[in-house]
Amino acid sequence: MFFGFLPPCYDDSDTDVQSIMLPEIIYHEAGHAVVSEVLCPESVSLIYVGNGKSRESGVTHLYNNQNTTSQYWAKSRLTTVLAGAASTEQKFGTVDSGAHSDYERAFDLAEKLVEENCIDGLHLFSFKYGHSQNYLSAQEQVVTAEVERYYRKAKEIIALNKEFLEKLAAALAEKKLLCEADIKKIKDECKIVPVAL
């Protein structure tokens, strides 16, 4: 599973824009990695930030070796998807303008949890009844509430594991590419605070 940060298009010859965007991308990708590692240890295989063809970009690659049908796995993926934006907001106090695809993925994951896994009760189980306007309205409210809840959970995990975030971001700023061994070494140097979903 990949999480990527692709900011709005701009002229990549504009070094002022590049110097502004790269720190945000670093913390965005570090946020994905921190939350994933706290919730599912040894789940991140690679983090990269750098120049794409026309813009700065970043990628965090996660192993997909978890039981993908479990609610814990689904909730941890939802929280991890939101962690890039949560990290950027906490570090810079701004909304993450490059997280659109992460937000879309988060809403898709939350909808699946609500419809198929009944995390908010059986009344929104999607396979039993048709999709009336009342059903769709109720589902929209519950899905939005779940995304908000897991966004707050991502922020909590990042706040409690700030040392790991800062060390990971510093290493990423220096090297631009961190492999599994690099991530493990940094993590082993930090006090990791587990957080329940």
Q: Where are these predicted regions, by residue range?
A:
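Soluble catalytic regions of large protease machineries
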Residues: 7-27, 33-197
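Conserved AAA+ ATPase small/helical "lid" subdomain
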Residues: 1-2
